[in-house]
A protein has these predicted regions:
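Cys/His-rich microdomains that often coordinate metals
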Residues: 1-5, 21-24
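Short linker/helix segments within small regulatory modules
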Residues: 2-16
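Short metal-binding segments enriched for Cys and/or His
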Residues: 12-36
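Charged, flexible boundary elements
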Residues: 40-63
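Beta-lactamase-like hydrolase cores
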Residues: 60, 64-87
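RNase H catalytic domain
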Residues: 71-72, 78-82, 97, 101, ...
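Short beta-strand scaffold segments in enzyme catalytic cores
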Residues: 88-92
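A short, polar/acidic, helix/strand-boundary loop motif
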Residues: 97-114
């Protein structure tokens, strides 16, 4: 603390700065918790780690992770930076066996567009009579399709707060979602160790490894 500040506020005793707060100290004391995880970045790409830090191959994912459902369609997408180049990935598994997987890349995109693209491709690979859970780690995208989009549609694809972002993707995804009435769209936490969500994340970052 500068002496000038202490002279200006006589009698005041400094407690601690944000850098040395008890909350930060507790976080740093946790085993295997890197300092950078204290302040997590927003968006599906970097919940707790950046896209580049999470850039595992699919084989590395299978070796490292074992938790989570063994049946379902898992999706992920993101860009680095946001906006910027990005990718999406989808894997459909049944009893731990891969039924299908897809991934793609866009040189100029956003996190949300890639998340929507991943979900769109997920429903494209499923037959219309499929009965399976489809997972996304984007709560925004899940709520958009399951809660908000039907209301926007009734109002002529308008919402009170302004234009609907990524409207063409939202409309396409809503049509595909409705064409699969026995499928359930669910949110799952990002980078929580769920094996097949991590696998979808790896597919979504394949474009980065392909550049090397």
């Amino acid at each position: 603390m500068p002496q000038a500040a202490l002279d200006k506020y006589a009698g005041w005793e400094p407690r601690y700065c944000r850098e040395h707060s008890p909350q930060r100290a507790r976080a740093l004391d946790k085993p295997n918790t890197p300092a950078q995880s204290v302040a997590k970045s927003r968006g599906s790409v970097g919940r707790g780690r950046s896209l580049r830090e999470a850039n595992l191959t699919t084989n590395e994912v299978l070796d490292k992770f074992t938790d989570g459902p063994e049946t379902g369609v898992f999706t992920d997408g993101g860009s680095a930076p946001n906006p910027g180049p990005g990718g999406w990935g989808v894997v459909w598994v049944k009893d731990g066996e891969i039924q299908a997987e897809r991934y793609g890349h866009d040189p100029d995109t956003t996190n949300n567009r890639m998340e929507l693209m991943a979900l769109t491709e997920a429903f494209k690979i499923l037959p219309e009579d499929a009965e399976v859970e489809v997972f996304s780690d984007s709560r925004l995208c899940v709520q958009t399709i399951t809660e908000w989009a039907p209301g926007w549609e009734r109002r002529g694809w308008k919402k009170k707060s302004g234009p609907i972002k990524n409207l063409e993707l939202v409309q396409q995804l809503l049509r595909l979602y409705r064409a699969h009435p026995r499928c359930t769209l669910k949110w799952t936490a990002a980078h929580s160790g769920t094996r097949w969500n991590e696998y979808a994340d790896s597919l979504s970052t394949a474009w980065m490894r392909d550049k090397k």
